[in-house]
Amino acid sequence: MQQSLIRDFAHVTVWIFDLDDTLYPPEDALFPQVSAKMSEWLMRHLHVDATEAARLRDYYWRKHGTTLAGLMAEHGIDPWDFLNDVHDVDLSALRPDPVLAAAIARLPGRKIIHTNADCIYAERVLAARGLSGFDAILGIGEAGWHPKPDLRAYDAIRAAVGFDPVEAAMFEDAPRNLAVPFSQGMRTVLVGPGCDGPKGLPMPPEAMAHITHRTPDLTEFLHRLAQGLAPVAL
């Protein structure tokens, strides 16, 4: 199994990581804070109650990909007003993870963050986790305000970084965000239990044919991988 895993990634020179619930455990309960703030923002600015805010968020997620994308498309909001508010969260639950940091550092090639959040928030989270050395941190603004799983988001990131998708691997906790990378030829790694959507429901197996690898433990997966991969010339 170890040799098969190494063969599957031997060609990879670009490693792309999602942020929330991928580079820290979901049990750190950071995203629930963000989620609550999103609902509060809708209640405050759209003058709706909690039930309607939840309904709108589900609708925006299904139609536009994210709550922010829906608000921009249907209400023309300033994205920074929203992002600065919902990402003002307590990061004290996050702890440095030197083992994960070392595993990422050992991967041969470039390491990229691609998140639907903004770069300022991403940098705060990475600092709290003790993760550094990424070649690029690309957020929703760098993706032209197109969120994953929108094809335009991936195209914008690829244009910004400059890489061949067949030489890349992407790590994500949301199954649907790996469909486009898979179609472009990337290795796709689902991190965690494989839940998706605002309700956190597990995805049925037939809906995950675009997942090439799965792991409940990103650190252990990367450690096994890095052990057998040789450095690449960039």
Give, region by region, the residue ranges found by the protein language model.
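Asp-based, Mg2+/Mn2+-dependent phosphohydrolase catalytic module
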Residues: 1-12, 105, 118-234
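N-terminal helical cap/lid subdomain that shapes the substrate entry/recognition surface
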Residues: 7-17, 22-99, 119-120
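Hydrophobic residues in well-ordered beta-strands that form the structural core
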Residues: 25, 113-115, 190
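Short glycine/serine/threonine/alanine-rich loop segments
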Residues: 48, 77, 109, 163, ...
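Residue-level marker of regulatory loop/turn positions in helix-turn-helix DNA-binding domains and
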Residues: 96, 114, 146
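Catalytic-core regions built around general acid/base machinery
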Residues: 99-108
